[in-house]
Amino acid sequence: MRSALFFVVVVTLAPASNAEGGDSTHQDKDWPKEWYETPRTASEMGITEYRDSPFLRGRDLPPVKDRLPDDPQVIHPYKEIGKYGGKAKITLGDSWQFFNWESALTISADMQNFLPNLARHWEVSADGRTTTIEIRRGIKWSDGHPLTSDDFIFTFDHIWLDKEYSPVPSRLILGGRAEKIDDLTFRYVFEDPNPQFVNLIAQYGNFMVDPKHYFRNWHPSFVDREELNERIKEKGFISWMAFIDAQRNARIEESAEVPTLRAYKVLSRTPTMMRYERNPYYHKIDPVGNQLPYIDAIDAEVILDNAELVTAKASTGQLDFAAFALRTQDIPILKLGERTGEIDVNVWTRLHTSDVVIQMNFNHPDQKLRELYLDVRFRRALSYAINRPEMNEIIYFGRGTPQQVSVHPTSMYYEEK
């Protein structure tokens, strides 16, 4: 019997910042406690022997020990140690739905703390102007090339701050510079306090590190511009910026050429199918020394703007996993499919305080409407007039939590009053 897993994301009726601290009141009791803590390493757990998937046998690869970092990070499985093998079938509306990302820092499962990932250690100065990061020794890109400080500095200097590629840089990097300390240690330094920068690293850090050894071949800071323009034309792009943007794309145009740090690398891509296979140099292991991931390959069918088709495939067991395209209104259909024993349906509360926000136009051309919208009494009355409990019952089957667009209860900034 084929087993599939589906998550339906249920919303609340009233987005919150990822929290940086707090208690453990929001931890899911079914999840491993290790998901909320700083991950341990192989040496800390006494792991000295490593294994990899038979899928990689017969390939011209170094031994698994030489493909892993010096002291790999240990990831605990959800319920039990997995078995190697298999190909998972999923769907993509775009590949942002397949969060196959790796960044220097990540966020704990309860959204309360920053945790190390590519980084072994990090520190933010007391004045919030300097963030120093030390990455784990021995992490490698999917082509076997070592990850170093140069990769992070390249991205900051030649992607984020390049005036051609990024004419309008993010406000979170303005006034900043990246400095190399050694091959594994670097720092970001800002003219003014920038305490939110570490949050950027944890949330979108996948876009803060690129393989310099690949992209330097396509950047005018490293290649003669005339020669580069000719090569870019041969690739079918109008500029080097367009080419690099396409290569860095994490959606359904994701490139199979670019080395990655992720668990899966793109094997092939067509308009209707993305095929991934395991990264032989992936840097994490499980508690018994198995190199992750467990699943060898993923076939992701590209289905754009057709939630009904995704629901039909999911409810009839044609997929192994589905989540983002499923809607709350699909729960009854999915529950019918669950009765056959072919699929499991899990309802997962999302960390948003609202799907819909009514925002008044305070600059409306009609003066009377503008005055009305600016009147806080009108806005309060409008809020009171929205029957959130009724919406919750009709639209969300009573699974939502009626509330205002405010701070999420998991946030360190949440106050009950």
Where are these regions (language model features)?
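N-terminal lobe/hinge region of extracytoplasmic solute-binding protein
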Residues: 48, 54-126, 157, 259-260
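Short Asp/Glu-rich motifs
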Residues: 74-75, 242, 332-333
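Extracytoplasmic/periplasmic substrate-binding proteins
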Residues: 105-113, 211-214, 220, 274-279
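Extracytoplasmic/periplasmic ligand-capture domains
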Residues: 18-41, 54, 108-110, 123, ...
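Edge beta-strand plus adjacent loop/short-helix module at the start
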Residues: 104, 144, 230-259
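N-terminal short leaders/motifs
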Residues: 72-89, 129-141, 213-227
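Short, low-complexity disordered leader/linker segments with a strong preference
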Residues: 1-78, 177
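Surface-exposed binding/hinge segments that line
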Residues: 170-243
